[in-house]
């Protein structure tokens, strides 16, 4: 593993037998930690460029994978477009996985796309968005009327930029793209562990319409397969990732109750319940994010959050299998919690 820019610039003209080079954002995150080993196992033997503000933290999260000769941890800030462009050029990056969030997500993401264009080495992008149809037809039909959460709405804008505002791959600075649209992470439930075990209360207001759930490992697999595809089959497509079945707050509390053998009650998604949720979340994150999350859950209550049968089948094609079971996640999680208590 190397640190910094100890590599010569590589030409963007690659032969078919040249191993690809992928720049992976958020490599220490829920998706990234699962994605890195998948990419290292691919027959194409890609080189992985992992930018980070904290190399020591990232290396500790990667465990033994951080010592692989094809892993290059680069110290720098992905919010700096100059750093990004230099990194893409220096390492001859051929494809990127962009997984970004934050209050400045729009500017950082657009700057990222611009750096890719200027570098002229990147030929494919896998962009992490969110589950849902964010196309023009849906917008004209009124989809945005209930979307008030900034971290969700920004993805509509970014998807529109990709669909209607980037240079074609065949042109200088152009690249193809695949959008991954995950539903609500299984792992979100782990934030409610203390509330579930000590208070018998599932504190996430998922609403009465139902939301799809997704294993971050499935998102990582979809991303790995989309990077490997390099725009041959999945270019210009958005693939939803998650369960076809949706789960209400009551459904979720009932599942946890069944496995734990004790009654778990569900958070309400009416005005009073969402006010209480925001108050709780303000103790965990800043006030901007607390309100933004409340607005997202309000959308879930009004509209639900899921995918069609056709979208689900497209996912199965990309994954090469059905997505993971939410019920099985709960079973495994409770077993682990019980083992932790007994040790």
What does each of the following model-derived ranges do?
Residues 126-128:
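Short beta-strand segments at enzyme active-site cores
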Residues 314-343:
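Amphipathic terminal alpha-helices
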Residues 247-248, 311, 325:
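Residues that mark the N-terminal boundary/hinge immediately upstream of a DNA-recognition element
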Residues 3-5, 13-47, 51-61, 79-81, ...:
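Oxidoreductase cofactor-interface core, primarily capturing Rossmann-like NAD(P)-dependent enzymes
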Residues 253-306, 342-343:
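Terminal hydrophobic/aromatic helix or amphipathic segment near a protein terminus
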Residues 85, 110-113, 216-224, 326-331:
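Short, amphipathic alpha-helical "lid/cap" segments that border enzyme active or binding sites
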Residues 50-120, 132-141:
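NAD(P)H-binding glycine-rich loop region in Rossmannoid oxidoreductase-like domains
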């Amino acid at each position: 593993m190397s640190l910094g820019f100890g590599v010569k610039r590589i030409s963007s003209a690659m032969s078919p037998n040249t191993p690809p080079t992928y720049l992976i954002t958020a490599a220490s995150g829920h998706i990234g930690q699962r994605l890195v080993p998948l990419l290292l196992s691919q027959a194409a033997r890609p080189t992985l460029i992992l930018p980070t503000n904290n190399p020591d933290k990232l290396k500790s999260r990667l465990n033994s994978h951080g010592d692989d000769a094809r892993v290059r941890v680069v110290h720098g800030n992905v919010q700096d477009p100059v750093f990004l462009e230099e990194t893409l050029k220096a390492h001859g990056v051929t494809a990127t996985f962009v997984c970004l969030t934050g209050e400045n997500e729009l500017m950082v993401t657009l700057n990222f796309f611009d750096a890719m264009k200027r570098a002229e080495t990147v030929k494919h992008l896998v962009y992490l968005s969110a589950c849902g149809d964010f196309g023009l037809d849906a917008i004209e039909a009124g989809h945005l009327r209930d979307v008030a959460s900034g971290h969700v709405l920004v993805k509509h804008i970014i998807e529109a930029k990709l669909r209607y505002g980037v240079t074609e791959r065949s042109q200088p600075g152009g690249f193809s793209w695949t959008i991954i649209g995950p539903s609500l992470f299984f792992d979100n439930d782990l934030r409610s562990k203390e509330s579930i075990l000590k208070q018998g209360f599932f504190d996430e207001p998922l609403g009465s319409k139902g939301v799809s759930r997704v294993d971050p490992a499935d998102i990582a697999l979809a991303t790995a397969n989309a990077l490997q595809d390099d725009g041959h089959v999945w270019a210009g497509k958005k693939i939803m990732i998650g369960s076809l079945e949706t789960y209400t707050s009551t459904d979720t509390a009932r599942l946890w109750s069944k496995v734990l053998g004790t009654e778990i009650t569900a958070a309400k998604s009416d005005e009073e319940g969402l006010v209480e949720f925001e108050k709780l979340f303000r103790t965990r994150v800043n006030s901007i994010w607390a309100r933004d999350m409340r607005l997202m859950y309000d959308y879930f209550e009004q509209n639900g959050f899921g995918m069609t049968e056709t979208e689900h089948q497209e996912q199965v094609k990309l994954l090469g299998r059905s997505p993971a079971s939410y019920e099985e996640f709960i079973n495994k999680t409770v077993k682990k919690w019980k083992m932790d208590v007994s040790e």
